[in-house]
UniProtKB/Swiss-Prot annotation:
Main subcellular location of this protein, as a coarse class: secreted
Keyword Secreted attached: yes
Cited function: Essential component of the renin-angiotensin system (RAS), a potent regulator of blood pressure, body fluid and electrolyte homeostasis.
Record key words, sorted: Secreted, Vasoactive, Vasoconstrictor
The protein's name in its UniProt record: Angiotensinogen
Keyword Secreted attributed: yes
Modification after translation, per record: In response to low blood pressure, the enzyme renin/REN cleaves angiotensinogen to produce angiotensin-1. Angiotensin-1 is a substrate of ACE (angiotensin converting enzyme) that removes a dipeptide to yield the physiologically active peptide angiotensin-2. Angiotensin-1 and angiotensin-2 can be further processed to generate angiotensin-3, angiotensin-4. Angiotensin 1-9 is cleaved from angiotensin-1 by ACE2 and can be further processed by ACE to produce angiotensin 1-7, angiotensin 1-5 and angiotensin 1-4.
Organism: Equus caballus
Family membership noted in the UniProt record: Belongs to the serpin family.
Subcellular location, record wording: Secreted
Phylogenetic lineage: Eukaryota, Metazoa, Chordata, Craniata, Vertebrata
């Protein structure tokens, strides 16, 4: 649940 949404980081910062 982050403001910084990335294609890969989407799973990391769930």
């Amino acid at each position: 649940d982050r403001v910084y949404i990335h294609p890969f980081h989407l799973l990391v910062y769930s």
